[in-house]
């Protein structure tokens, strides 16, 4: 297994799909990385040479991925919560942030129903 950005990339998958196992790399970014590295999209990771894997590592390192991206996202949410803006309050209360209705739906964000005790 090739190790890129601290993640074991599956050998048996095509390169364009295998790179999506890295957090922050989707299909579009994966295709851009492969094009910049000069590697075909349909080649499997196990068929790549060590030099090609090194170029992939260099190309992936140009983007914010994995732990750095997770930290950046959590810090931006924390910043909103510290500011006390509307979006920050919604994050703090565990409610939908982007204007969805909450009277009937939003069960994913609110969690399971809490029964009213009589």
UniProtKB/Swiss-Prot annotation:
Any one GO cellular component localisation term in the record: cytosol
NCBIfam families referenced in this protein's UniProt entry, alphabetically: uS13_bact
Leader sequence residues: none
Keywords, comma-separated and alphabetical: Ribonucleoprotein, Ribosomal protein, RNA-binding, rRNA-binding, tRNA-binding
Superkingdom of origin: Bacteria
MF annotations from Gene Ontology: rRNA binding; structural constituent of ribosome; tRNA binding
Species assigned in the record: Salmonella typhimurium (strain LT2 / SGSC1412 / ATCC 700720)
Subunit structure: Part of the 30S ribosomal subunit. Forms a loose heterodimer with protein S19. Forms two bridges to the 50S subunit in the 70S ribosome.
A biological process from GO: translation
Protein's name in the database: Small ribosomal subunit protein uS13
Family: Belongs to the universal ribosomal protein uS13 family.
Alphabetized PANTHER family for the sequence: 30S RIBOSOMAL PROTEIN S13/40S RIBOSOMAL PROTEIN S18, SMALL RIBOSOMAL SUBUNIT PROTEIN US13M
Region: Disordered, residue numbers: 94-118
Record function comment: Located at the top of the head of the 30S subunit, it contacts several helices of the 16S rRNA. In the 70S ribosome it contacts the 23S rRNA (bridge B1a) and protein L5 of the 50S subunit (bridge B1b), connecting the 2 subunits; these bridges are implicated in subunit movement. Contacts the tRNAs in the A and P-sites.
